[in-house]
Amino acid sequence: MTLTGCDRTSDSARTLKLAHGLDTTHPVHKAMEFMAEKVKEKSLGRLRIDIYPSEQLGNEKECIEALQLGYLAMTKTSASPMEGFVPKIRIFGIPYLFRDAEHFWKV
């Protein structure tokens, strides 16, 4: 993930929206909460991440569109919804493309 638009000269706090479709008990959501805490801590409170789980701001496709329009700063999606935006990603949806996990990570 890339964070852009973080002006160090501003005294006011900035808030970034992060939306995803996972439940709040999911480990990835827990990691996002940890990241949000660290960002707030390391930025001395000047940068905050508000997390919207469980498709509160839309499904994966809608969140990608919101990113493009600038309504969201970050999202987490699976590869499948990305195929409509980045056609080259379709290669990863081919069944049996990889022999096993080791082959996947080598590629």
Residue ranges and their predicted role:
Residues 17-33, 54-58:
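Extracytoplasmic "Venus flytrap"
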